[in-house]
């Protein structure tokens, strides 16, 4: 999962989605909103909302999934989610800097 959270030992996926958590890799992979493909939730009126489809893009009507992400539980309780998985990279960048005076660094 591309989202790397500082509180990974104590947080839950549903709470991360409800608050649109960013995490430590937010610049590289985007927030959790950019990595969710589908959501299943219970709406406040008791209706069951299911958007766990395999279609990546759907432009028909309102995107309730995007409304639920970041709503902090006010628009519904998220019960399941489908995430986009990124390939793990092992890239490292190392920079060595040498100077005779600290003020030139």
Question: Which sequence ranges carry the predicted segments?
Answer:
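FAD-binding subdomain of flavoenzyme oxidoreductases
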Residues: 1-105
């Amino acid at each position: 999962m591309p989202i790397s959270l500082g509180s990974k030992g104590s947080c839950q996926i549903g709470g991360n989605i409800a608050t649109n958590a960013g995490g430590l890799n937010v610049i590289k992979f985007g927030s959790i909103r950019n990595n969710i493909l589908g959501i299943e939730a219970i709406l406040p009126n008791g209706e069951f909302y299911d958007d766990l489809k395999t279609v990546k893009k759907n432009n028909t009507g309102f995107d309730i999934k995007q409304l639920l992400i970041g709503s902090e539980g006010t628009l519904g309780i998220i019960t399941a989610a489908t995430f986009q998985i990124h390939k793990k990279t092992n890239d490292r960048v190392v920079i060595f800097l040498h100077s005779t005076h600290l003020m030139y660094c």
